[in-house]
């Protein structure tokens, strides 16, 4: 449970002690929201592609093409394996945490949580063909739920190949995707 303060403190300390930067928490970015508003500036959460560009596209579409937007489905697809049996397209630790965490989506004014990888759908992408995609929680849906008036549903899906899923399952089976403390025996001095 990443909201558990004790767990978060232990995890943050471990990351800082080891020099890791994979710990992600956008609360420090959200804290600037009012300051940016007061200054008349636009800020984009995360500022990558998703989140980032997807939020800009959504806001642009609302401003220039639609009176209202009721549904946003973000489909994050890439077929890249970089020639390896297991590869991620960004920081592996963050990627594996996103995929192994509970999913969620916004519908009719509230959040619905799903089990990790519970929702699978297929979609035929013009350039790369039909892919399996899975509903995940992703931070831009939080910002879109707040900033797109009248939105009824927002979901985020990401595609994964079978080799990626097989390797992820192996990591999960040996406990490497756990986010809770694991004790194997009583501590002794």
Where are these regions (language model features)?
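Glycine-/Pro-rich loop/turn segments that contact NAD(P) or position catalytic residues
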Residues: 2-90
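C-terminal catalytic/substrate-binding lobe primarily of soluble NAD(P)-dependent oxidoreductases
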Residues: 63-185
């Amino acid at each position: 449970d990443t909201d558990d303060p004790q767990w978060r403190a232990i995890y943050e300390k471990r990351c800082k002690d080891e020099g890791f930067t994979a710990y992600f928490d956008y609360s420090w970015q959200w804290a600037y929201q009012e300051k940016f508003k007061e200054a008349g500036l636009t800020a984009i959460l995360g500022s990558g592609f998703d989140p980032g560009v997807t939020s800009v596209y959504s806001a642009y579409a609302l401003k220039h093409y639609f009176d209202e937007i009721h549904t946003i489905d973000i489909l994050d697809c890439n077929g890249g394996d970089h020639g390896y049996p297991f590869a991620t397209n960004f920081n592996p630790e963050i990627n594996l945490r996103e995929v192994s965490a509970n999913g969620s989506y916004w519908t009719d004014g509230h959040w619905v949580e799903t089990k990790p990888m519970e929702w699978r759908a297929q979609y035929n992408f013009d350039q790369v063909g039909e892919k399996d995609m899975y509903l995940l929680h992703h931070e831009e849906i939080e910002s879109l739920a707040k900033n797109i008036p009248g939105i009824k549903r927002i979901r985020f899906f990401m595609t994964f190949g079978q080799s990626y899923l097989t390797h992820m399952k192996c990591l999960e089976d040996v406990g490497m995707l756990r986010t809770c403390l694991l004790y194997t025996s009583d501590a002794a001095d």
